Curated annotation (Swiss-Prot):
Cellular component annotations (GO), alphabetically ordered: acrosomal membrane; caveola; caveolar macromolecular signaling complex; cell cortex; cilium; endoplasmic reticulum; endosome; focal adhesion
Recorded family membership: Belongs to the caveolin family.
GO biological process, one term: MAPK cascade
Keywords: Acetylation, Cell membrane, Golgi apparatus, Isopeptide bond, Lipoprotein, Membrane, Palmitate, Phosphoprotein, Ubl conjugation
N-acetylserine: residues carrying this PTM: 2
Keyword Phosphoprotein: yes
Residues recorded as bearing Phosphotyrosine in the entry: 6, 14, 25
Protein name: Caveolin-1
Main location: Golgi
Length: 178
């Protein structure tokens, strides 16, 4: 019944009958088709973003976490006035915070665009150039490896076996004379 219309026992109309085994385009049966329709589809482009923990994989723990105490420190005996120290701390912290925000507002989206394009190109090249080249190389090198294997077993194995037998009979006796 290919190419025609098919009505199942419940009156649902199909253009192509759903076979028991199914195929790559249609689910195996009507029950599975309903399950597929009920499942939520998750798209990698629409996943939720965590606005609280913005570094869940801890990429920048040891690099960018710079606080006032990591940069400026006064050893014992050389302390400035407490007010100056507090003002310096506040100035450093607020400047770092707002200047980072300003830079990310100005350059964040263009840099995200640049890095997105870069990693898209990198992924494209890896998928469409690197992996096929490696697979092609592995296929081509199999022929060479078979020829090399025959060469080794034909010429090198007997040669080195003979050399091994020659040197296996060498005995060294060391005696210490007093």
């Amino acid at each position: 019944m290919s190419g025609g219309k098919y009505v199942d026992s419940e009156g649902h109309l199909y253009t192509v009958p759903i076979r028991e085994q199914g195929n790559i385009y249609k689910p195996n049966n009507k029950a599975m088709a309903e399950e597929v329709n009920e499942k939520q589809v998750y798209d990698a482009h629409t996943k939720e973003i965590d606005l609280v923990n913005r570094d869940p994989k801890h990429l920048n723990d040891d690099v960018v976490k710079i606080d006032f105490e990591d940069v400026i420190a006064e050893p014992e005996g050389t302390h400035s006035f407490d007010g100056i120290w507090k003002a310096s701390f506040t100035t450093f912290t607020v400047t770092k915070y707002w200047f980072y925000r300003l830079l990310s507002a100005l350059f964040g989206i263009p840099m995200a665009l640049i890095w997105g394009i870069y990693f898209a190109i990198l992924s494209f090249l890896h998928i469409w150039a690197v992996v096929p080249c490696i697979k092609s190389f592995l296929i081509e090198i199999q022929c060479i490896s078979r020829v090399y294997s025959i060469y080794v077993h034909t010429f090198c194995d007997p040669l080195f076996e003979a050399i091994g037998k020659i040197f296996s009979n060498i005995r060294i006796n060391m005696q210490k004379e007093i």
